[in-house]
Regions:
Chain A
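Glycine-rich phosphate/diphosphate-binding loop of Rossmann-like nucleotide-binding domains
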Residues: 30, 47-53, 60, 152-217, ...
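Phosphate/nucleotide-donor binding subsite
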Residues: 60-100
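N-terminal phosphate-binding or glycine-rich loops at protein starts, especially the Walker A/P-loop
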Residues: 2-54
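Short, glycine-rich nucleotide/cofactor-binding loops
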Residues: 17-29, 80, 150-160, 300-307
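Short glycine/serine/threonine-rich phosphate/pyrophosphate-binding segments
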Residues: 27-32, 85-98, 102-116, 127-131, ...
């Protein structure tokens, strides 16, 4: 399935726009186009991809036309094969064909992965690409959680590759040298967890990576490590649990502050002090997750992405492309 | 390993005290003894278990003396076999021997499970006991998460039993008839997840249980179901992730409110409105998790349990014992 990839020189990528799936996400196309416009205004070249009649006003941005759209409900594996002229598949082709330096989509995650994998190909020796999702760490660089949901079933060898790729990504994106790696388990002891975790623990000790040891669910938001490695099932459950808990508390706080004039005034007093934390925890400010292990840069943004989230994702996509993240990731597993 | 169990008549249990491991937990023995004293003051018979010289002042409560203590760091499997005169093992024996209606410990979770399993035995047909942990649901009954950490590796047949036992427990503890069952996965579709999840999904459809379908991590605190079924690895990661996220936000809020006099005043204004939520989310108010599938009632309290948490755990233990929860759970899997 994976084709041989030859990486483009970074200097060549610098001249290319970021391809943006105009039809992906709950607020597409309006929020996507607005976010792309803001990125363009900040000096980043972008090109939209989508059916002209559905995208509507492009706000002056270039549009690569196509005829199909993969919806959130479409079966990922099937849709990327049958909808070959969809905005997702065409965006991935622009990266493959050297017409874009990176792609960004807030659409169907499985189909985004499938399009990127089929069109950009897998890096040599990569068993499976994974999702590296940034988890905010107030006052520090985000923690990279990998795999955040691409592979429900994993082998120890896959998890070791996730660790290598996520470490390279952490260095490329956040400048962290020798990132500390944690393995998600249900206790700090090497003897705790599933056979998958125990075997991966042993293998990680031999990699030469900066392996910290096991970490637990409670460490996600207060992490002693820079990278958390896990299978895509556990990673996805943990990430959504964390997001759900944060959203829940924010909702409670919003309700309480909105109770009456007195509580509103109290909320206004606290707001300037809370804002730095809210900003740090805001998924829209984080810039999306990256697919690790492909022959090009693909950024997956939240389905609920706002224009701001898309602008950030575009910016991150370009930085990773011209920063040579793909070469770094390729080198990490050779 | 499991012995045949014969359940005691509920009327007999009503006359028995709750056995409390005086040496279990980060704040043992002082918080444990104080919590037991408060339960006794509320009219619940309790008996402490522990080495007299370590327990110290029992505040007038009866003490079953023993000579050993299993620490948090002790290997669970080994310690329950070698430390036969430990407070944990002796507490489980009191239940087995009809001298206590239930046991409560905030100590080493693995050793608590081991002691209870070895001494009380497994209910007939139970493949594996599991931990049923209550997750607070503000404004409603708590959601029972099973397995919250007893079995890192599970089969579909085990998960189906967890669903049955947790449903019986949910009815016994919270009075919910025909509890709605959710299966923790990474998407609502039956086709999402690991082979374990997919096969369990199929089996749950045939059980006659009130099976809702798959739920996701984000549903833990905002749940459409009364019971969430998962393997003990995923359940433990999800529970700790949720607790970590809540603790993190509470910490941020506390810091912000403590900034200066103005923010303290604002905090005082919001406090009465926040308290109901904080109370609902307070693990100390929840009363601990129950081991499901044993021949007696064993309540596992948080390692960080306060006196209040222990009082609640004792109260829950007694209620479950005299409410016939063990018979209900036994009946659920026959």
């Amino acid at each position: 399935m994976a084709r041989a990839v030859s990486l483009r020189p970074v200097g060549e990528l610098e001249l290319l726009p970021v391809a943006v799936d105009a039809m992906g996400g709950d607020h597409a196309p309006s929020a996507i186009v607005a976010g792309a416009r803001a990125a363009a205004d900040a000096g980043i070249a972008v090109v939209l991809v989508g059916p002209p009649e559905l995208v509507g006003d492009t706000l002056g941005l270039p549009l690569v036309p196509c005829t199909e759209v993969i919806s959130m409900d479409d079966d990922p594996a099937q849709s990327v094969r049958t909808k070959k002229d969809s905005s997702l598949v065409r965006a991935a082709e622009l990266v493959r064909d050297g017409q874009a330096c990176a792609m960004v989509s807030a659409g169907n995650t499985g189909a985004t992965m499938g399009s990127a994998l089929l069109r950009m190909g897998r890096l040599p020796s990569v068993l499976r690409p994974c999702i590296g999702a940034p988890i905010p760490r107030p006052g520090g660089t985000p923690v990279v959680l990998a795999d955040a949901g691409a592979n429900a079933e994993c082998t120890p060898q896959m998890l070791v590759q996730f660790a290598r790729m996520a470490a390279a990504y952490c260095t490329a994106r956040y400048g962290v040298e020798q990132p500390k790696i944690g393995l998600l388990s249900i206790g700090e002891e090497a003897t705790k967890g599933t056979p998958l975790v125990k075997e991966t623990h042993e293998l990680l000790l031999e990699t030469g990576l900066n392996f910290f040891g096991n970490v637990e669910g409670r460490d996600l938001l207060n992490s002693p490590v820079d990278v958390i490695v896990t299978d895509g099932f556990t990673g996805n459950v943990a990430l959504k649990t964390m997001e759900g808990a944060l959203k829940f508390v924010m909702g409670v706080l919003g309700d309480v502050i909105g109770t009456d004039d007195e509580t509103k005034a109290a909320g206004m007093t606290l707001l300037p002090h809370l804002l730095p934390f809210v900003g740090d925890l805001d998924p829209d400010a984080i810039g999306g997750a990256m697919l690790l292990g492909l022959g090009g840069v693909c950024i997956i943004s939240h389905g609920s992405s706002s224009a701001k989230a898309i602008t950030n994702a575009i910016s991150v996509g370009r930085e990773l492309a011209i920063g040579g993240s793909t070469s770094r990731i390729a080198a990490s597993i050779l």
